[in-house]
Amino acid sequence: MRLSYLSLALAIIFVLTIMHASNVEAKASADPEPDAVGSINVKNLMNMIREQITSRLKK
């Protein structure tokens, strides 16, 4: 009999916790890069890396 009271109490606590939880919103902290790509192949990735390295070495 006490086990059913325990499970009922846990269920009530669980429901109250969900009901009184604060709402959370996720916000982007940075703007996306203009050349960002969703899917990229390896050749394009290597070319992008090579361009970044050579541009930094020229400075």
UniProtKB/Swiss-Prot annotation:
- UniProt entry tagged with the keyword Signal: yes
- Give the signal peptide as a residue range, or say none if absent: 1-21
What the entry lists under InterPro entries is as follows:
Pilosulin
Pfam families hit by this protein: Pilosulin
The superkingdom listed in its UniProt entry is Eukaryota
Q: What is its main location?
A: secreted
Q: Please provide the record's keywords in A-Z order.
A: Antimicrobial, Secreted, Signal
Q: Which residues form the propeptide?
A: 22-38
Q: Record's family?
A: Belongs to the formicidae venom precursor-01 superfamily.
The protein in question is named: U-myrmeciitoxin(01)-Mg5b
Q: Which organism is it from?
A: Myrmecia gulosa
